Amino acid sequence: MARLAGVDIPREKRLEIALTYIYGVGKTRAHETLAATGISADVRVKDLTDAELVQLRDYIEGNYKVEGDLRREVAADIRRKVEIGSYEGLRHRKGLPVRGQRTKTNARTRKGPKRTVAGKKKAGR
């Protein structure tokens, strides 16, 4: 397995797909990276030379914030929003959707499993 940005990328996959295994690199950034380095997107990772791997590693680490640095930055942004008391920070704190989605129905991924609340008891006859 080849290592780029601290991630083992799969050897059998095409390079443009394998690069997306790095957190912070999607299809668009993978295409940009390959165009800038002049490496074909169709080549398999196992067929890359050491020089090409070094070239890819240098380009990605030099131009993009990826993996741990990006995760830390995102976490810091969320922490800052919570601390300043913004609406987004409040939604993060409560564990609710942040970007305006409805919560009357749906939003189960963010809210977690249903918690059943006891209903009102009927009066006995």
Swiss-Prot record:
Q: Name one GO molecular function term.
A: tRNA binding
What top-level branch of life does the organism fall under? Bacteria
What are the cysteine partners in each disulfide bond? none
Its GO CC terms are: cytosol; small ribosomal subunit
Q: Which residues form the signal peptide?
A: none
Q: Does the keyword Repeat apply?
A: no
Which InterPro entries does the entry mention? Rbsml_uS13_C, Ribosomal_uS13, Ribosomal_uS13-like_H2TH, Ribosomal_uS13_bac-type, Ribosomal_uS13_CS
Which SUPFAM superfamilies does this chain map to?
A: S13-like H2TH domain
In residue numbers, the region (Disordered) covers 93-125
Q: Does the keyword RNA-binding apply?
A: yes
Supply one GO BP term: translation
UniProt keyword annotations, A-Z: Ribonucleoprotein, Ribosomal protein, RNA-binding, rRNA-binding, tRNA-binding
Q: Where are the transmembrane segments?
A: none
Return the NCBIfam families for the record. Answer: uS13_bact
Q: What does this protein do?
A: Located at the top of the head of the 30S subunit, it contacts several helices of the 16S rRNA. In the 70S ribosome it contacts the 23S rRNA (bridge B1a) and protein L5 of the 50S subunit (bridge B1b), connecting the 2 subunits; these bridges are implicated in subunit movement. Contacts the tRNAs in the A and P-sites.
- Name the family the entry cites: Belongs to the universal ribosomal protein uS13 family.
Q: Quaternary structure per UniProt?
A: Part of the 30S ribosomal subunit. Forms a loose heterodimer with protein S19. Forms two bridges to the 50S subunit in the 70S ribosome.
Tell me what this protein is called.
Small ribosomal subunit protein uS13
Organism, by scientific name, is Paenarthrobacter aurescens (strain TC1)
